[in-house]
């Protein structure tokens, strides 16, 4: 059983229109992706120094690794928190850390956009086995995409194609233990579309069953949350953040 009491249940989160799929993306700063801030600029400089190559993908991989090392995974609830604030706190949720990665990308001139997914709350049951009744009915997930060359690359395939990641780690992502969605990107296939399913069935890393709705693509996560709201209503975010904001995701 999941809860809708703490969510903005009055919002009608409808599937994306055909036009929503045309989101052009951007590299401009936003309230969340405040890449002009000195903390984001410092992370960009460090990522450039740590990158194994000179390409844009190498830069993003280095930034991802640095964020994993420097920003502790916690159950923070404010998806609209700026990237610079997350860096200052040195802790953040998967959503907040993905926003930091996006901010670094934009700071480097790499356009980004997000795909909005409405994910079933049961996906997070393994994290909160004794608090299932408080887990939101659905979670609004902003899943980044990066413009690398002439194509958009989803964050799920930043390290390698889903097939290659699946072969390397057939167990898939279980949403348990210390590996969060953010860390999983480096070694595990995260398949929201069921694209890895074949004639003989679906793989263990197919997560399409927990996707309630595809909200479409937006030029920024700011636009997604403005259109569909965050997972929890403001009072719930404040109360929940005070209780869970420092709790490690493990």
What would you call each of these model-derived segments?
Residues 2-10, 15-24, 32, 119-250:
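His-Asp-centered catalytic microenvironments across diverse enzyme cores
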Residues 3-89:
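Secondary-structure boundary elements
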Residues 44, 60, 96-98, 102, ...:
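Generic hydrophobic/packing signal
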Residues 77-135, 139:
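Active-site neighborhood of thiol-dependent amide/isopeptide-bond enzymes
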């Amino acid at each position: 059983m999941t809860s809708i009491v703490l969510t903005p249940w009055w919002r009608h989160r409808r599937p994306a229109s055909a036009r929503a799929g045309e989101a052009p993306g951007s590299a401009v700063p936003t309230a969340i992706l405040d890449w002009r801030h000195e903390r984001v600029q410092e992370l960009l400089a460090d990522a450039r120094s740590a990158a194994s190559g000179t390409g844009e993908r190498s830069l993003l991989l280095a930034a991802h690794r640095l964020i994993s090392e420097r920003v502790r995974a916690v159950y923070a609830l404010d998806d609209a928190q700026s990237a610079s604030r997350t860096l200052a706190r040195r802790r953040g949720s998967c959503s907040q850390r993905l926003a930091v990665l996006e901010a670094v990308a934009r700071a480097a001139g790499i356009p980004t956009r997000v795909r909005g997914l409405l994910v079933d709350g049961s996906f997070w049951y393994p994290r909160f086995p004794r608090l299932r009744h408080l887990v939101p009915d659905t979670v609004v997930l902003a899943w980044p995409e990066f413009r690398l060359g002439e194509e958009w690359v989803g964050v799920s395939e930043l390290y390698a194609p889903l097939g290659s990641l699946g072969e390397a780690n057939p167990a898939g992502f279980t949403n348990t233990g210390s590996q969060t969605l953010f860390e999983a990107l480096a070694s595990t296939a995260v398949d929201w579309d069921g694209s890895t399913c074949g004639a003989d069935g679906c793989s263990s890393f197919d997560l399409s069953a927990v996707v309630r709705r595809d909200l479409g693509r937006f030029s920024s996560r700011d636009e997604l949350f403005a259109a569909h709201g965050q997972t929890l209503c403001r009072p719930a975010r404040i109360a929940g953040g005070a209780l869970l904001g420092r709790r490690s995701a493990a």
